[in-house]
């Protein structure tokens, strides 16, 4: 599963783990990605989305129809 949110566009960040002695090791900071299934009344079907935690909250506030319309407008196939 790709670490990419379909709503917010959140992607992994890169940086360093820093030990107590301040040695640095490269690492990757992954977003909190979840697969979530929603019923979309306008499409009359279920849609499975790959979402970050913030993307799930966005759907709670704006509604699934509005968010799916934006995703489809970007040309992403659902």
UniProtKB/Swiss-Prot annotation:
Record region (Disordered): 1-31
SUPFAM superfamilies: L28p-like
Entries under Pfam families matching the protein: Ribosomal_L28
GO BP term, pick one: translation
GO molecular function: structural constituent of ribosome
InterPro entries, sorted: Ribosomal_bL28, Ribosomal_bL28/bL31-like_sf, Ribosomal_bL28_bact-type, Ribosomal_bL28_sf
Keywords: Ribonucleoprotein, Ribosomal protein
Signal peptide positions on this chain: none
Cysteines paired by S-S bonds: none
One Gene Ontology term, aspect cellular component: ribosome
This protein's record includes keyword Glycoprotein: no
Entry's family note: Belongs to the bacterial ribosomal protein bL28 family.
NCBIfam families, per the entry: L28
HAMAP family per the UniProt record, alphabetical: Ribosomal_bL28
Name this polypeptide is given: Large ribosomal subunit protein bL28
Organism: Paenarthrobacter aurescens (strain TC1)
Gene from which this protein is expressed: rpmB
């Amino acid at each position: 599963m790709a670490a990419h949110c379909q709503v917010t566009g959140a992607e992994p960040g890169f940086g360093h783990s820093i030990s107590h002695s301040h040695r640095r090791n490269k690492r990757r900071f992954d977003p909190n990605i979840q697969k979530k299934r929603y019923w979309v009344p306008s499409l009359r079907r279920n849609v499975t989305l790959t979402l970050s935690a913030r993307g799930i909250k966005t759907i709670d506030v704006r509604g699934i129809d509005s968010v799916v319309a934006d995703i489809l407008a970007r040309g992403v196939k659902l």
